[in-house]
């Protein structure tokens, strides 16, 4: 049972004010030192990660997200160094104007203050959140899942040791206990926490949205579609579908449903051919099932049910939906999308333009795999999450998306009556 956490929240809030005094040069030095420590402490971090892995069935779709390796830690260290090379998002002049009475107004970017992150079995998020929050001048409170508790504790202990060497208040990053009481406390930490960002399943995101008393930016849940249009190129479609589905099945930008125009059902076996090697189970509607029967392995071909559509599989599974028209494809996406990433494969430019205008999603692709929905791929550096809402940010959230602004007004004794 978690004890009262208000003392912890107050300590983080106080540390956030100290963080505002750090120079960008010092912040960059800390980030590079954390990258060095990540490599130096690889054995320790991996040994703690193994404890978490030992408690999880390897067939669990979360297993790949939970697993850290030497190569992944090298990638994390490289990402941390990359954040250090990015320009500071703070103190940017967003707008400048003067009023007739002589007042000068300047709109300046500033940190949010304290950001709470609630996430599941993804220990790499601990690194990403810390590096982005530090660079943007935000203190952070991390609430990881019990599946990754040993990994997260190891990571935060490594970060705290670096902060101590720089004489920086370690409360700028705090890891909460991995229990539900801590989640409830964080969601109700009004007066201490400025923003909550959940990263994980739709169940987690819905719970946070329904129970938080603090502003929330929803991220993570991705029910992604690729529509193979009447005018689609078969080779491009096959490559895009295979990549979007199998690159990493456990991530939110992975493909969940291929929609195909009925005039192109004859191309469906070719479009799905590469999926056989990855042993992707296909849940096909009646027309798609008939088109694939005899071409796709029988043990991997299943009739679709209503539940097959609108499902984020996070596994080697994919639904196939047949439509009579472009409009029907748009309707299916509208009904089942989580507004994350949607793709059309077509050689018809007018059709592509209509798709990008009409489809309501954070990222809309033409002839490109949805696997590219990622902060680094967008040139933003690491990301704190992928927002599926419209306020305050949308899509991959880099440094700029976790800042706010203030108006600074200068004058010479002006008054208003």
From Swiss-Prot:
<keyword id="KW-0560">Oxidoreductase</keyword>
<dbReference type="GO" id="GO:0005737">
    <property type="term" value="C:cytoplasm"/>
</dbReference>
<protein>
    <recommendedName>
        <fullName>Gamma-glutamyl phosphate reductase</fullName>
        <ecNumber>1.2.1.41</ecNumber>
    </recommendedName>
</protein>
<keyword id="KW-0963">Cytoplasm</keyword>
<dbReference type="InterPro" id="IPR016162">
    <property type="entry name" value="Ald_DH_N"/>
</dbReference>
<keyword id="KW-0028">Amino-acid biosynthesis</keyword>
<keyword id="KW-0641">Proline biosynthesis</keyword>
<dbReference type="GO" id="GO:0004350">
    <property type="term" value="F:glutamate-5-semialdehyde dehydrogenase activity"/>
</dbReference>
<keyword id="KW-0521">NADP</keyword>
<comment type="function">
    <text>Catalyzes the NADPH-dependent reduction of L-glutamate 5-phosphate into L-glutamate 5-semialdehyde and phosphate. The product spontaneously undergoes cyclization to form 1-pyrroline-5-carboxylate.</text>
</comment>
<dbReference type="GO" id="GO:0050661">
    <property type="term" value="F:NADP binding"/>
</dbReference>
<dbReference type="InterPro" id="IPR012134">
    <property type="entry name" value="Glu-5-SA_DH"/>
</dbReference>
<comment type="similarity">
    <text>Belongs to the gamma-glutamyl phosphate reductase family.</text>
</comment>
<dbReference type="InterPro" id="IPR000965">
    <property type="entry name" value="GPR_dom"/>
</dbReference>
<dbReference type="GO" id="GO:0055129">
    <property type="term" value="P:L-proline biosynthetic process"/>
</dbReference>
<dbReference type="InterPro" id="IPR016161">
    <property type="entry name" value="Ald_DH/histidinol_DH"/>
</dbReference>
<comment type="pathway">
    <text>Amino-acid biosynthesis; L-proline biosynthesis; L-glutamate 5-semialdehyde from L-glutamate: step 2/2.</text>
</comment>
<dbReference type="InterPro" id="IPR020593">
    <property type="entry name" value="G-glutamylP_reductase_CS"/>
</dbReference>
<dbReference type="InterPro" id="IPR016163">
    <property type="entry name" value="Ald_DH_C"/>
</dbReference>
